[in-house]
Design a protein with these regions (language model features):
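Catalytic metal-binding acidic patch
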Residues: 35-71, 76-80
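Residues in well-ordered beta-strands of folded domains
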Residues: 28, 47, 103
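Conserved NTP/Mg2+-binding pocket subregion across the NTase superfamily
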Residues: 70-167
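Helical scaffold of the NTase/Pol beta-like nucleotidyltransferase catalytic core
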Residues: 1-31
């Protein structure tokens, strides 16, 4: 499958930074689609990561000196919610992370980020050689702290279910 960000950008349904569609390294279906719990009314959750241009990733290359003068706007993530594609009848929620933030969250064993490394192939919308290398080595991200992170995440999700919350 092709990149959802590139397709929605081409349809002018989203307005990401100009460099984002061509620098996205990975996109995947998450949420109900990934867990096989979606239906025709489900929104389509797309999560991924991108490699910003080097002057955004390393602001000193653009002449920025931290704390002096005009500061370059940082890129941590691009997100847009409730994007309605009338041609497909689907609504999208999109979050594309800066590769640095993605790695930080993944190395912290954030359950939502680790999930992206273990998505079923059918849920990988767009991947590059870089993502495939990361995916091939995904178990290296896991450590003993994962137990506590996933346990806490599971308990919070059960609490939401018991309270009848959807989010």
């Amino acid at each position: 499958m092709a990149s959802a960000v590139a397709r929605l950008d081409k349809l002018k349904l989203i307005n990401p930074p100009a460099w984002l569609p061509s620098n996205t390294m990975f996109e995947g279906w998450t949420g109900s689609v990934a867990y096989g719990a979606s239906n025709d009314a489900s929104d389509m959750d797309v999560v991924g990561f991108a490699m910003p241009p080097k002057d955004i990733l390393f602001p000193h290359l653009a002449g920025e000196i931290s704390g002096f003068g005009n500061q370059i706007q940082r890129f941590d993530q691009y997100q847009q919610h409730h994007v309605l594609d009338k041609s497909s009848g689907k609504e999208y929620d999109i979050v594309i992370y800066n590769i640095v933030k993605f790695f930080q969250l993944t190395m912290d064993n954030n359950p939502n980020m680790v999930d992206n490394l273990f998505l079923p192939r059918r849920c990988v919308l767009h991947s590059t050689e870089m993502y495939e290398h990361i995916r091939d080595n995904r178990k290296l991200f896991l450590h003993k702290g994962a137990y506590h992170k996933f346990r806490g995440y599971s308990l919070s999700q059960m609490s939401k279910i018991n309270k009848g919350s959807n989010r």
